Amino acid sequence: MQTTDLGNKESGKIWHRKPNPSTNEGIIVNIVHVDASHPSKSARFLHAGFDSAGDSFIAGDHLGNVYLFNLNRNRFDLVQKTMQACTAIAFNLHRRTEFLVALADNSVKCFDTGAKELVSWMRGHESAVTSISVHPSGRYAVTTSSDTAQLWDLDTFQRKRKLNVRQSVGIQKVFFLPLSNTILSCFKDDSIFAWESDTLACKYQLPIPEDGTKLRYKAFAITRDGRMLAAGGKSNNLHLWCLDSKQLFRIIQMPTKVRSVQQLEFLPENFDGGSSQILGVLSQDGIMRFINIQTCKLVFDIGSHDNGIVTSSVSPNGRYITSVMENGSLNIYSVQALSKELNKPPPPLVKMVDLSKDKDSTGNKSGVSGASQEKVRVSSGRTCRPWKSKDQIVRTKYLRPEDTTTSEDKENTLPAGLSKQRLQALLKGFGEYPAKYRMFIWRSLLQLPENHAAFSSLLDKGTHTQYKLLHQEYPIKSRKLLRVLQRTLSALAHWSAIFGETKYLPLLAFPFVKLFQNNQLICFEVVATVITNWCQHWFEYFPNPPINILGMVENLLAHHDKELLQHFINYGVTSQVYAWPLLETLFSEVLTREEWLRLFDNVFSNHPSFLLMAVVSYIISSRSPLLHCNQKDDFEYFFHHRNNLDIGNMIREAYHLMDTSPAEIHPRRLLSDFEPLTRGQYPIFNKYPKFIVDYQGQERERIRQEEIEYLRERQLTHKVEAEAVKRRLEDEAWYQQQELLKGAEEQRRKLLMDEEQKLLHQRQRLATVKRELRLKELQLLDAARRRFLRYQQDQRKMELRRLDDELERKMSLRERETATIAKDVEIRQMELEAQRRFFEQQLAKEQEAVTQEVKGEMDANRRRADLEEQMFWRLMETEEDLKDKKLLEESLAKAERLCVETDWKIQTLQKQKCDDQERGKRYVEVSKMTDDVREKERELCDVLKAMETRKWAEVSEKMTQLETEELASSALRAKRNQFLQERLRQEAEPVNISEDGNEYFERLRDLSRNSTQNDFSSSAERHVAENVCLNDVSASDSSTHFSLDRGRGELENRERALISEVRELRQKLATQARRKYPQLHFSETNWT
């Protein structure tokens, strides 16, 4: 069993090697969908549906992906992503590329597989759609949910009608009946109604069984002819309804292990006329059992208890079954492989038949009137082949009525349950079988075994050598028909060697091939059956026509129409002219299609001798035109072309000949009765002169070898002849080429001389042109040089003008500034003069006021002046020392900061330079010597570590030096403060302290923070109060006082804050450097 993973592919092959499904499982391929990104998660398929042809189907998973699988082309394609899980799918619309999908949001969408686009979106359901049924024409669809069913027009995608029911009842399923305009609705109370799809008028209602056989219907299936309905539910019983009589005609009981039916599907078969006999029953255990509803035999089953089936879909052609498994995968089964064992003659299966025919009482109770119900029990054991878990073999047991059957009835009973006598009576009454059931009747009459395995083995042998060039002898327009004819003839030739030598076999088989071109197995078996029964003794005189058979025809014609036979003899027309063309073509040349089908309805329904009677009947029915023929070509033309003939009269004449011909000349005496082909393997066909066929085969092989040798010699001769002709042509071409070369050489010499003369003239003209160009170039260069000099001169003039303008502007600006300053100076002088005059006035007033006190205060003023001068100069010296020290400290701090920054920059540059140099070296060394890389790296690391140690040592020294300088600065500052305090204390001792003075030394008191300084300032104030300065105008509180402090304390605070900021800035720079270049060493680097 092959397994295909779709993965994330949007298209690809379904299987990668030729499928070889086993007869035990029948699985062609198992399809899974695993997400490549999440291998543990896989998409689960939910539903699948085939198209109307049965060779393609679509399947949707729970992620909303819809795939198209083409089994003929072995290809799958992702056609749509709906992003929602699907609840139902339909793919049999009238537009082959469109499909319907019901989604989890209660909507139904129509998509196109070719364009991969949304065609329409249909809404209207309030609950999930459980099924979609499409009309046989593909133009209407019925969607069913639990509460409503809606009819849609697929041309306009508009809703036409809507079926509503009571919530207590509920809808189970609504679907179209095939081959009709009837809609069947099934409800949860087991009631079934039929509606006319055009008018939606109720046509009929199936009666509800009331004898305790309620099944609570859940699953339904309808045959292709729409005449039989199968229903099942929560029981192991199946109800089969005949929709023509509206009666329940059979109840099938499944094995006890089947407790409920989940799904029912009829399996279509070829030439069953739509009345399928195989019903697939999916039960609750996940196994789908296919049973024959007529014989109640278990045909085959699919699925297992380990991995059961959720839902299945059967292709309309009956070749494939697609099943969605419990694990979310998709299995594709081959019906041919599953039913291959059925072609072998198996032992009988267990069948328990219980016929209860209570026409009156049962019919009145159950509402099924005038019909008999047959209850059949299906056994679970089988003996034809081992099936999975079925290990019990139950012996066959038949329960039949006690009435006996005669041998005649046994002969007239066909395998499909048809009566040959009734068919013959029908044929005599109507003259032909119904066209609808003709293939099914022929298949039953011929009792075809359908040996799939044997036929496949014949096809596997390929095209027979005799029929490889069939298209040349029979140019058929239809390539398909030609291919089927070629395969059928090749299979016949592989079956028996005589058919490879029979020239008229294509003519004999062609009408059957054209009739059964869609089923090659049936075509082959029909032709083989015709050959083995209706072509008896044809090949005994091979390769001559069957003289014995033609003799029978001639004897019959002599008995029934001697005049016509004498006419043939008079003109030399033998039976090979008037009988053999009809037999070798089986009347296909002289009859139309309808006439031929009517004829063979009678041929297949009678003894093989009827075909010879039909030949004689055709000749006798055409005696009038034949008696008027007097040339042999006319006779040959007559029996190879269509003629005006009443086929009904001909067939009646054939029956008359069958009844009135004497026994001694009747073909029945020499021809055997009908014998069908054997099942399993085809019978041996050796009724021909084998030595002639072998001799012809040998002769043909010899002729073929001679033809091959002749062709080889002819090819060799042609090759030698072609070589000689080629050499002769080459010699002639060489001589012609030599002559042409001589003429061309002379012509080229003349042309060369002419060209040389032209070249000389051109060179002279070129030299002249060059001289002219050179002169022009010199003139242009001179003009350009002059133009450039002028340009430079202009530029310089412009620059000079610009400089002159700038000078003038600056001069005018300077003059304006000078005038402004002069005006400002004059105004300032005026202000100073005014202030001086104001002060002089003030001084004059004050001097006049204090003139009387000048003498008394001169001494005090002198002493106070000396004291102030002494203190002022002392304080001035101290402040200058402080300023010098402050400048020194600021300079030192700035120098240290610059030193650190410079060292850091130098180190960074050195590191970068070293890194660049070492990196360049490494690149060179890596390209040259790979083995020395690691050693160089270690050396480099050592060097870097040494540099790191050295640098960090320098940093430590710098930091130590900085701390030393800070300590020295702090010591100097403390020493300076102490010196000032001592000096102030020494100066404050001889001064008398007075508490009544003014606040002359208020700033000096702020500097002195201890008690000594307070005493000193108080004594100074008292002393000043006693000795009033001459310039002091007023001693009141509002007068202005002169301070000698000049903000020394504030300067000290600024100094400390500045040093602190410098320290913090240095720390920040160091931190940033460490972050940018951590630890100032490099780790070992791996070069690649």
Curated annotation (Swiss-Prot):
Gene3D superfamilies: Ypt/Rab-GAP domain of gyp1p, domain 3, YVTN repeat-like/Quinoprotein amine dehydrogenase. It is found in: Cytoplasm, Cytoskeleton, Microtubule organizing center, Centrosome; Cytoplasm, Cytoskeleton, Microtubule organizing center, Centrosome, Centriolar satellite; Cytoplasm, Cytoskeleton, Cilium basal body. Keywords: Cell projection, Cilium biogenesis/degradation, Coiled coil, Cytoplasm, Cytoskeleton, Repeat, WD repeat. Disulfide bonds: none annotated. Pfam families: RabGAP-TBC, WD40. WD repeats lie at residues 33-74, 75-116, 117-157, 158-200, 201-248, 249-296, 297-334. Residues 432-607 form the Rab-GAP TBC domain. One of its GO terms (cellular component) is cytoplasm. One of its GO terms (molecular function) is molecular adaptor activity. Molecular adapter which is involved in cilium biogenesis. Part of a functional complex including OFD1 a centriolar protein involved in cilium assembly. Could regulate the cAMP-dependent phosphorylation of OFD1, and its subsequent ubiquitination by PJA2 which ultimately leads to its proteasomal degradation. This is TBC1 domain family member 31. It comes from Xenopus tropicalis.
